[in-house]
Amino acid sequence: MSWNTLHKPITVLAALLLGTISFTATGAAKWANPSLLVTPDTVKQNINKPNWVVVDCRDLKDYAKGHIPGAISLGKRCKKALRDTTARVWRDTSKYEKLFGKVGISNNTHVVFYYGDMKTLTDATVGFWIMEYLGHDKVHVLNGGLDAWRKAGNRLDNKPVKKAAATFKAKIKASRYAPTDEILSVARGKTVRQLIDSRTKKEYAGKDIRAIRGGHIPNTTVNVSHLDSLAKSINKKTGKMEAVAYLDPDAANKAFGKLDKSKRTIAFCQTGTRSTMTYMQLRLMGFKDPANWDESWRVYGSQLAFPVGGEQWYNFAGLNKKLKKLEKKVAKLEGKK
């Protein structure tokens, strides 16, 4: 049976299966590359095939409580298992070759990453982006994650799964990785790129500072928080409108539809994590040259020579006062012992 036969179009009904959501989609927008996403049915029909590996992107403890039967774990959340301690990709690609080969992934393997909820959605997209950066052309994400699997009436298993080792060789696709020098050139007006800031509005405005300085990259094209590029729904428990952990073409088109798909387009955030979701949306929409900026604001905002729009400095004096107050409270508590 062919891949096209197995892959079923993702409909609004599939989104409604996620449980506590209630929203209306027009269905006007369609993904240009829909096969990057898979449905529970596709996973169920293929998971036991030797050339398919399904990766649970949650913590090992969550995996042990219940996972898709046949799915493997990388031992920790994907965004930690696939990057170094500074949340950056390993530049030594042999580490990826060893890691993926050990869990049974070869260059001919269809790899499906899935998440548990909104918190781990970007773990799956981190995995997706890294594999595309490594040149793997058979990588997918289970849209709706574990919730979609459950709502489709499928069972979970708590038995650990280990695949036979395989050989994986990286074929780096450098264009998927945006270096800081490229962003700096855009900020200084020397290079033209479409920059998507996937941080929150407060981060963009410098009101939420997560580096030495807050603010934004000059010449940024658009600021769309990663949550704002998802469909919204009414949470029946809280009564509030919230983003749904489901990649929806209408929501993505609303966020990025006015951008030029033929131009190089780079997504970034604070650590290059949230922006991997934006990167995947760009791939789904058919952007010709999308990239993720791995170093993102955490590196840029701490480089004092780099230009910043709406620049705001971190209040170290205020932090020092808070620390002194805390020290006094601790001293009092210790004195009572």
Residue ranges and their predicted role:
Residues 2-13:
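Bacterial N-terminal signal peptides that target proteins for export
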Residues 11-22:
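Bacterial N-terminal signal peptides
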Residues 26-53, 60-194, 198-337:
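Rhodanese-like catalytic fold shared by cysteine-dependent sulfurtransferases
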